[in-house]
């Protein structure tokens, strides 16, 4: 039964799907899930929106922030630096328009998505808009001869990857335009391949090419990427989504380009091919987080295996305590329709159940007809899915996975999450400078939201990458007396939590603080009733 309005602020955090959360077995947990369980106020999963023509005005961005956008993604495969600079300016203007109210202010992060080392076809008949029809069974010659760079047609196709003849074999497959067109290699020469069209269709200019299974030796960071990354450092972006990462060395190269000035930018590696999946552990070790980029991945590995790769990557990221983003086609049909398909709803929910920290929208918000509806839909689905996570089992397993650690901060984080379960805390309040304390708490996946109070704007923005962290930016001057300064920040978190309906007077919250100034000393845990 719905609660009367007078109790609208009631903390549903502890009670949503509580019966299921306390089950002894996973089967019993599934049996107890209840569609009438009232949803919580807080959503713990981050929502990343790609900003494009449909969403780059300040007014639209304001509405998207209100609807739940946490991170704005700029896709550098398209657009000039001037175009992106204006988008970044608009995102910041939209974010700052809420700054007058510190309680409702939400820091929004900016992410730069690199184009990465791609292989592309040439121009069809010298025009960017011309198309030719490739018929099934027809013969198509692939050439490296630059004379054909702008003269491709249905008989001959130029590619910009010089080593293609070395890395593909007779019998190999070549996919063009997101896998819509497939070719099989019949014969190879020094600078050409003869292929047969297996799946035809109309082919436009400058389309992407995939070579599944081939050991492509393109540089990890292209010349364009270097310029884009330097632009990102100048624009003070918060994170980089690095495309087509195949090995740890690729991540180090991105890090090198970002340099000293960009050393605090988080690098999220996009796994988009077989080699990236195979060498996942070394990539994870070198990265700040991972994106499961299902688009290209679904061409490079068989479509029916993508879900295996998704579960494996999310599992390993959860075990390592690093953020993971699930992306591509999450609500694809909402580009043209106001409601998602049932399959898409399940896909978003299952990404959350798998353990994704963030879920991403691409075309839905960049060029779709219903950008706001797509953000709201992801918000609603994620909120329901989070409550259906079997937290009891998950916490036990995460605690067991890190039982070897002797890091005091990790012990504090684990203890605070365990305490939050035991006393049904409505939230965990963490005071953090670098963000590390909050990240460690998030690692153990508490049911309750983590309100992370920081004075560092970048720490606040980057916190959205981690599930369950609600960053609160404290703009008050530091008080001389440390204890008073701690109280100031804890009270700010209490006010934010009450205003957002996370908890009400009399609820219990867990407070994690340091006992002296500086980063790296979070070592005091208190269980505090909300005043």
Curated annotation (Swiss-Prot):
One of its GO terms (biological process) is protein tetramerization. GO terms for cellular component: cilium; cytoplasm; cytosol; nucleus; pyruvate kinase complex; rough endoplasmic reticulum. Keywords: Acetylation, Allosteric enzyme, ATP-binding, Cytoplasm, Glycolysis, Hydroxylation, Isopeptide bond, Kinase, Magnesium, Metal-binding, Methylation, Nucleotide-binding, Nucleus, Phosphoprotein, Potassium, Pyruvate, S-nitrosylation, Transferase, Translation regulation, Ubl conjugation. The record marks 270 as: Transition state stabilizer. The modification 4-hydroxyproline is found at residue 408. Pathway: Carbohydrate degradation; glycolysis; pyruvate from D-glyceraldehyde 3-phosphate: step 5/5. The modification N6,N6,N6-trimethyllysine is found at residue 3. InterPro entries: Pyr_Knase, Pyrv/PenolPyrv_kinase-like_dom, Pyrv_kinase-like_dom_sf, Pyrv_Knase-like_insert_dom_sf, Pyrv_Knase_AS, Pyrv_Knase_brl, Pyrv_Knase_C, Pyrv_Knase_C_sf. Its cofactor is Mg(2+); K(+). There is a cross-link at residues 115, 266, 270 (Glycyl lysine isopeptide (Lys-Gly) (interchain with G-Cter in SUMO2)). The modification N6-succinyllysine is found at residues 66, 166, 322, 498. The modification Phosphoserine is found at residues 37, 97, 100, 127. Substrate binds at residues 73, 270, 295-296, 328. Residues 389-433 are annotated as: Intersubunit contact. L-serine binds at residues 70, 106, 464. Residues 307-531 are annotated as: Interaction with POU5F1. Its EC number is 2.7.1.40, 2.7.11.1, 2.7.10.2. GO terms for molecular function: ADP binding; ATP binding; identical protein binding; magnesium ion binding; mRNA binding; potassium ion binding; protein dimerization activity; protein tyrosine kinase activity. There is a cross-link at residue 166 (Glycyl lysine isopeptide (Lys-Gly) (interchain with G-Cter in SUMO1)). The modification Phosphothreonine is found at residues 41, 195. Mg(2+) binds at residues 272, 296. Catalyzes the final rate-limiting step of glycolysis by mediating the transfer of a phosphoryl group from phosphoenolpyruvate (PEP) to ADP, generating ATP. The ratio between the highly active tetrameric form and nearly inactive dimeric form determines whether glucose carbons are channeled to biosynthetic processes or used for glycolytic ATP production. The transition between the 2 forms contributes to the control of glycolysis and is important for tumor cell proliferation and survival. Belongs to the pyruvate kinase family. There are 4 isozymes of pyruvate kinase in mammals (L, R, M1, M2) encoded by 2 different genes: PKLR and PKM. The L and R isozymes are generated from the PKLR by differential splicing of RNA; the M1 and M2 forms are produced from the PKM gene by differential splicing. L type is major isozyme in the liver, R is found in red cells, M1 is the main form in muscle, heart and brain, and M2 is found in early fetal tissues as well as in most cancer cells. NCBIfam families: PRK05826.1, PRK06354.1, pyruv_kin. This is Pyruvate kinase PKM. It comes from Rattus norvegicus. The gene is Pkm.
